[in-house]
Structure formats: C-alpha cells, structure tokens
Amino acid sequence: MNKIKRLFINKKKNILNIYFTAGYPSIDSMPLILKRLQNLNIDIVEIGIPYSDPLADGNIIQKSNTKSLKNGMNISVLFYKLKKVKKYINIPIILMGYYNQFIKYGEIKFLEDCIESGVSGLILPDLPPRIYLNKYKKIFKKSKLAFIVLITPQTSLKRLKRLSSITDYFLYIVSSNSTTGTKNNINLSFLERIKEINVPKLIGFGICDKKSLNIAFKYAEGAIIGSAFIKAIKKSYLEKSIEKFIKYIIK
C-alpha cells in the first residue's frame, strides 16, 4: 500500500508535513534531515528538487535552491542519496519539482527512480491536469505513485471539485496568493470555503509558527511547513537546529 494512503487511513488530523530543499544546507544533509524528522515523528517529508527558477517560491526557498545547485545537487544525485537511506526511512516522501525537470530527466525513468528510491508521491505544480490525465495518469497508477494537486484562493469552485477528483489521497491547499514564506497572510475566507470539500487537505504557504499551525489544523487535516524550517536549520549544528524547530512548532 502507498505510504501516504496508509497514513491518511490511520491518522485523521494534525498531520505535519515538513518541506526542505534537497542539497541544502549541504549536499550531504538530506539523510540526516530525513532520519531526524522521522525520529521526531513527523508524518510526511516533502523534498524540493532544486531548480534555477522556482516560480511559486519566496526568497528563503529560492536562496536554498541556489545554494543547493552550487553544492552540486541534481536529480540523479537526489535519487542516489534516497536509495542509500531507503531501508532506514519509513515515513512517506513526496518530491516537489517542475514539469520541465520531469520531462528533461525522462518521465518513465523519473517514475522508476522514484519507486526504487522509496518515494511515495509527486507534486508538479505546473503540470496541467489535462496533460496529467491524458498522458501520465495510467503510468502513475501502475507505479502506485501519488499525484498531488495544488489549489489556490483563485481556484473556482467548479475547478476545485474537478481537482479534488484528480488528486491522490490529499489536496495541497495554498493558503494565500503570496509566494512561500510570506508570514501571516493566510486567506481565512478561502479556508472556510474549502472546509467542506470531502477530500483530506494539507495547508501550506505561510505556516511558520504555532498560531498559523493551529489555523491549519482547524481548517484541514494537517499543515505543510517549508520556509520556516529551511530558515531554522543550520549547517554547523544541523541535528540540534532541526530538533529545536520541531519542538518549538509543536509544543
């Protein structure tokens, strides 16, 4: 069974998904980050594939992408490192990247490497749902990889219902029209509007402290924290900075 599916069967609320950029703060950081987050009982880990032009991301994640690329991280290195820690990591791993990266690497090879690396799902925010349905859905289903869809405050009710039927296991709710890392800009009227959608939801963008985390937990099954986590982790004392942030956010 897909690990994301199993998680949502066994846990119905207060799900915490932590995002970080592969190859940041150093090219060798990822295994330690994964192990530490697992030991701290984080539910899902989302790993960003570094990209030179991350459209939806704010300053913090953009800088982590730049640093990661300078460190030598790329998709091949990412899969290599994930394969090395696969037997130690039991929590679901989701990769987040861009459609161009997916195509350039080779779609079939990308999905095969996901399976071999223990990845449970993919987020490709700029992959049009129509293209996914026509070209990739059968491949995803065959590989048992989840395809996660994002919705924003600008998503119409009609489109929202359609996307709810496409996504696997949960919807990624973008809490505002801002880029990632924007503090205290959560669109509460939007969260009220999607509250009754009968699909599990995780809220991201702007979840940075206990207050915003509690808002996410109120309106959805869980939250996604990215920029705040990346800002908090330090190369020189990586393990301690991870533990300090997680304990702060869930205290």
Curated annotation (Swiss-Prot):
This is Tryptophan synthase alpha chain. Pathway: Amino-acid biosynthesis; L-tryptophan biosynthesis; L-tryptophan from chorismate: step 5/5. It is an enzyme of class 4 (lyase). One of its GO terms (cellular component) is cytosol. Tetramer of two alpha and two beta chains. Pfam families: Trp_syntA (PF00290). It catalyses: (1S,2R)-1-C-(indol-3-yl)glycerol 3-phosphate + L-serine = D-glyceraldehyde 3-phosphate + L-tryptophan + H2O. The alpha subunit is responsible for the aldol cleavage of indoleglycerol phosphate to indole and glyceraldehyde 3-phosphate. The active site is at E46 (proton acceptor), D57 (proton acceptor). It comes from the Bacteria. NCBIfam families: trpA (TIGR00262). InterPro entries: Aldolase_TIM, RibuloseP-bd_barrel, Trp_synthase_alpha_AS, Trp_synthase_suA. CDD domains: Tryptophan_synthase_alpha (cd04724). Keywords: Amino-acid biosynthesis, Aromatic amino acid biosynthesis, Lyase, Tryptophan biosynthesis. Its EC number is 4.2.1.20. GO terms for molecular function: tryptophan synthase activity. Belongs to the TrpA family.
